[in-house]
Amino acid sequence: MVSKTSLRETVRGHRWRELGEVLAARPDLLNVRDERGRNWLHLCCATPGDPADSIRTADLLLGLGLGLEDAAFTEGEWKATPLWFSISWGKNYPLAEHLLKLGAAPLYSLFAAIWNNDSATIRLLLAYGAKVDEDSAPGESPLMGAVAWSRFGPAATLLEAGADPNLVNPKGDTALHMMLKKGSAIEHFRLFARHGARGDIPGAKGETAASILRRKRDPAFRALADELATA
C-alpha cells in the first residue's frame, strides 16, 4: 500500500519511474503538502542527488501539473519556490539551470546562493535576469547579505556584476560600516574600494567609514581611507 511517507522517500530518492507509476495509480496524492507547505516538487528540488534523475523527477511532477512558481511558504514578497529549494537545499546547479530554462523566475534565490558561497549559481541567476540589487529581503541587498555573512567571494561576484557598494541598510550603515563593526580583513575593504565604495557616507552613529579608518592603529587601514571614493 502506498503511503505519504513511502511516496516522500520515492520523491527524495528521485526515483522518477516508480513515482510515475504511483501517481498514475493514486492521482489523489499529487497535491499533498507537508506541514511546511512543501509539495512533491519542492521536496524533489530540496534533496541533493543525481542531477539527471532530479531533472527527470521534476519534469514528471511539472508535467502532472505542479507549478514552476508555486511557493511552499512566503515572507513578504519573498517566496520559497522550487528554484529556491534547488539552490538553497539541493545545491543542484544543473537542476536550477533546467528550471530557469523552463522559465522559472530568477527571483528570491540570490541570498541562498550567497549563503552557500556559490558564485557560479549567483552568475547563473544574474544571467537569467536576477537583479543584482534586488530588494526581496526588506531593507537588505544581496551584497549587504554577503557582507553580513562574511561571504566575500560572493560579494566580489556581485560587485563585478555591478552591485551598488554604497547602499544603506535600515540601521543607517553602509557595507563599509558593517565591515568595520565586524573587523573584516583589509583585503575586503580594498575589494570595495576598487569598486567605488564611498568613505564619506555617514553611518548610523553619524561617522563616515573614512573617519573611522583614519583612527586605526594599522597604517594600512589609515591609508585605505584615502583610496575610498567621495561624492
Which stretches of residues belong to each language-model region?
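Ankyrin repeat boundary/linker residues
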Residues: 34, 72-76, 103, 136, ...
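Ankyrin-repeat inter-repeat connecting loop/turn
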Residues: 29-30, 68-69, 106, 132, ...
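N-terminal segments that cap or nucleate solenoid repeat domains
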Residues: 1-43
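Eukaryotic tandem repeat interaction scaffolds
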Residues: 110-171
